[in-house]
Amino acid sequence: MIFSKISQVAHYVPQQLVTNNDLASIMDTSHEWIFSRTGIAERHISRDEMTSDLAIQVADQLLTQSGLKADAIDFIIVATISPDATMPSTAAKVQAAIAATSAFAFDMTAACSGFVFALAMADKLIASGAYQNGMVIGAETLSKLVNWQDRATAVLFGDGAGGVLLEASKDKHVLAEPLHTDGARCQSLISGETSLSSPYSIGKKAIATIQMDGRAIFDFAIRDVSKSILTLMAQSDITKDDIDYCLLHQANRRILDKIARKIDVPREKFLENMMRYGNTSAASIPILLSEAVQKGQIRLDGTQKILLSGFGGGLTWGSLIVKI
């Protein structure tokens, strides 16, 4: 049988740094108010780079690190809720920029679960035997979706991109995965609505910026994500002691605190970087993974078991246990 493995990781964030104190100068908030509720101290905000620009930086790094030629890449998946445009896809722009002429490319929209969903799909593509090498990138410029007069959401989000190179392997590396969607709760977190605009249609007011029921999302993350992770471990015969690190979507430090207690895994196994990047949606997990590899916490030698778990709009949530 053919399986997939993560062979390279990379990330990139815009240079411009916006601190909580910077935000306090343009809205009614403070560093103490933001940090005590979220664990976020600063975030990177793009000045002139689009989502595709961030993703291209990651793709270039992955190619350089791997030594592969661009025409060896079979597919590119970009997980994003903030594409440059509805058409063409962000992934198509990445494919063109790196001259991956043999690759097919598409975007995936699953909000903050996007990277996990995309990685699960990419694993199946390689397992089919039809493809050998693929890129999975999470990239966001959420700053363009934020209402900068709404302190409840404006303080949360940042821009960035991270990604992995997947290669075919004789050994199984994606050990377990449950993916979930509950569209009945979709109104808890919305952004980028469009309205009918033809002369034959009745239009309605569309909500363009991020709107969130914070309490509902907080409760969802604690309840549903924790339950999913516990079920995942039970069904896969992988115990909490087998997990080396937990890389969860970087939405809120208090969410990580509560999930750690719920699943009874030591808090120190939960890596975090939301204090420096904020919530970067589909980019948060691959950025965290790339930084952990840079720091030597994750070795990419196939000896560690890592829990990846995303959750967000849709509502969507999903987890993978990956040998890496």
From Swiss-Prot:
Catalytic activity as recorded in UniProt: malonyl-[ACP] + acetyl-CoA + H(+) = 3-oxobutanoyl-[ACP] + CO2 + CoA
Residue segments, region ACP-binding: 250-254
GO molecular function annotations of the record: 3-oxoacyl-[acyl-carrier-protein] synthase activity; beta-ketoacyl-acyl-carrier-protein synthase III activity
Major site of localization recorded for this protein: cytoplasm
Disulfide bonds: none
EC number of this enzyme: 2.3.1.180
One Gene Ontology CC term in the entry: cytoplasm
Pathway: Lipid metabolism; fatty acid biosynthesis
Family (UniProt): Belongs to the thiolase-like superfamily. FabH family.
NCBIfam families, sorted: fabH (TIGR00747), PRK09352.1 (NF006829)
HAMAP family for the chain: FabH
UniProt cross-references to PANTHER family, sorted A to Z: 3-OXOACYL-[ACYL-CARRIER-PROTEIN] SYNTHASE (PTHR43091), BETA-KETOACYL-[ACYL-CARRIER-PROTEIN] SYNTHASE III, CHLOROPLASTIC (PTHR43091:SF1)
Role summary: Catalyzes the condensation reaction of fatty acid synthesis by the addition to an acyl acceptor of two carbons from malonyl-ACP. Catalyzes the first condensation reaction which initiates fatty acid synthesis and may therefore play a role in governing the total rate of fatty acid production. Possesses both acetoacetyl-ACP synthase and acetyl transacylase activities. Its substrate specificity determines the biosynthesis of branched-chain and/or straight-chain of fatty acids.
Oligomeric form and interacting partners: Homodimer.
Protein name: Beta-ketoacyl-[acyl-carrier-protein] synthase III
Origin species: Streptococcus pyogenes serotype M49 (strain NZ131)
Lineage per the UniProt record: Bacteria, Bacillati, Bacillota, Bacilli, Lactobacillales
